[in-house]
């Protein structure tokens, strides 16, 4: 999420983060309210993963550019969001066969799809429309990919007047999967409702930095680890699951000191 002047913008990554850890969302909101940006610790492994992801995306870009020399590259519009949105709208109106790094917006939500692919399905644009495609390093599909692509499809629906039929992901193996947008539209609406309720709640709902699968890639992981150490949290016990910790909490055991007493 970003604060751009008086406007607060939310991206697909905010929805993915919210589903993984509601504490992450609250930390991001507090940082924006304080006019601060969350600081991520240096992580060579994450930097390597990001570099590999960019290389995978670039390889697919070159493959599509070889097929479609008139591919529209929105990155040429520069980093300004308004310029990228305008460049994307212009490329869609012109009927570009492929649009790279398309910027889409509806209300407070912004998305940057790796690619938009032209299809011959009529829309408000004319006798054609677009579907989103993202590249991912993983070798099998994940729920977060589906949520992200569903979000882009929803933004596309507002941009072209009709929902795209399919959304696509290219995995690290090079395999391309097509998913029906309609199969996941209800799921996205549920996530949006929950997310909007959480960010609008006054006072903010109480959350805690419980360890989860998202932690290794989270910008708040150092702060959360420090909080758990300061609290003598049960998650510091090797192999302690969240369910086991909850059972102990129900018995009045909330810290390592209490566990060892």
Give residue ranges: language-model regions.
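Metal-dependent nuclease catalytic cores that hydrolyze phosphodiester bonds in DNA/RNA
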Residues: 1-125
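Short helix/loop capping segments that flank catalytic or ligand/cofactor-binding pockets
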Residues: 27-28, 113, 124-126, 143, ...
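Short cysteine/histidine-rich zinc-coordinating motifs and their immediately flanking basic loops
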Residues: 33, 227-238
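Active-site ExK catalytic segment of metal-dependent nucleases
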Residues: 101-103, 112-118, 127-139, 148, ...
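Secondary-structure transition/capping motifs at alpha-helix termini
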Residues: 121-128, 158-162
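Metal-dependent nuclease catalytic regions and adjoining charged, substrate-binding loops involved
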Residues: 136, 140-143, 155-229
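Accessory alpha-helical DNA-binding modules that contact the DNA backbone or grooves
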Residues: 231-232, 240-261
């Amino acid at each position: 999420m970003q604060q751009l002047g008086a406007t607060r913008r939310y991206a697909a990554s905010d929805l993915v983060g919210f589903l993984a850890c509601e504490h992450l969302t609250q930390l991001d909101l507090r940082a924006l309210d304080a006019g601060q940006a969350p600081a991520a610790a240096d992580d060579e492994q994450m930097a390597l993963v990001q570099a590999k992801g960019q290389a995978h995306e670039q390889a697919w870009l070159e493959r599509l550019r070889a097929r479609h020399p008139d591919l529209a590259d929105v990155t040429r519009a520069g980093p300004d969001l308004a310029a990228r949105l305008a460049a994307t709208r212009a490329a869609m109106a012109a009927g570009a066969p492929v649009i790279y790094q398309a910027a889409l917006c509806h209300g407070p939500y912004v998305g940057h799809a790796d690619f938009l692919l032209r299809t011959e399905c009529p829309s408000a644009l004319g006798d054609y429309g677009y579907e989103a495609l993202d590249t991912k390093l993983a070798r099998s599909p994940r729920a977060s990919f589906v949520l992200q692509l569903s979000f882009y499809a929803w933004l596309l629906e507002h941009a072209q007047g009709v929902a795209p039929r399919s959304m696509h992901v290219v995995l690290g193996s090079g395999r391309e999967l097509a998913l029906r947008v309609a199969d996941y539209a209800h799921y996205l609406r549920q996530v949006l409702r929950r997310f909007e309720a959480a960010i609008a709640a006054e006072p903010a709902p109480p959350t805690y930095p419980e360890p989860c699968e998202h932690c290794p890639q989270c910008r708040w992981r150092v702060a959360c680890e420090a909080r758990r150490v300061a609290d003598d949290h049960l998650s510091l016990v090797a192999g302690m699951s969240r369910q086991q910790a909850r059972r102990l909490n129900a018995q009045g055991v909330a810290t390592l000191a209490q566990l060892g007493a």
